[in-house]
């Protein structure tokens, strides 16, 4: 008879201490770091000033690679840099057109007021006594 295979033990296991339990306390799981890849792709495709969207895309890809490798701290750092570059890219994309629009509106209002004042000046009738 072959006894190489384990057999079922007919004896019931007896615990060494009655009521002894092992409890593991785990902290709250941290959410995985964000890489902002979609935002970086849109920033890159919009072709903003100084190629900030391209830099954001590079850091987003680095963050995703580090997350896959398991280095969550490096992924968090690269994701933070990608977020900063995305914010800068959005600001460089939105602020200059808004400033230009503000300058055009204030310039148009100033020219309208200037034209109104000059029209009033040229419509004034002078008497002959004013030239003496």
From Swiss-Prot:
Top-level taxon: Eukaryota
Tissues where the protein occurs: Detected in osteoblasts and fibroblasts (at protein level). Detected in bone.
Record carries keyword Protein transport: no
Residue numbers on the Cytoplasmic membrane side: 58-86
Extracellular side: 1-36, 108-132
Cell membrane listed as a keyword: yes
Region (Disordered): 1-21
PANTHER family linked: INTERFERON INDUCIBLE TRANSMEMBRANE PROTEIN (PTHR13999), INTERFERON-INDUCED TRANSMEMBRANE PROTEIN 5 (PTHR13999:SF10)
Family: Belongs to the CD225/Dispanin family.
Protein name: Interferon-induced transmembrane protein 5
């Amino acid at each position: 008879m072959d006894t190489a295979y384990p057999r079922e033990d007919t004896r019931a296991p007896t615990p060494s201490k009655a009521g002894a339990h092992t409890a593991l306390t785990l902290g709250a799981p941290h959410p995985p770091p964000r890489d902002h890849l979609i935002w970086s792709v849109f920033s890159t495709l919009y072709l903003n000033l100084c190629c900030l969207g391209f830099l954001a895309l590079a850091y987003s890809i680095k963050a995703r690679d580090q997350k896959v490798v398991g280095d969550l701290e490096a992924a968090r750092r690269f994701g933070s840099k990608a977020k900063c570059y995305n914010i800068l890219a959005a600001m460089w994309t939105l602020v200059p057109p808004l400033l230009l629009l503000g300058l055009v509106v204030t310039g148009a209002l100033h020219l309208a007021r200037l034209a109104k004042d000059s029209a009033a000046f040229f419509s004034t009738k002078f008497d002959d006594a004013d030239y003496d």
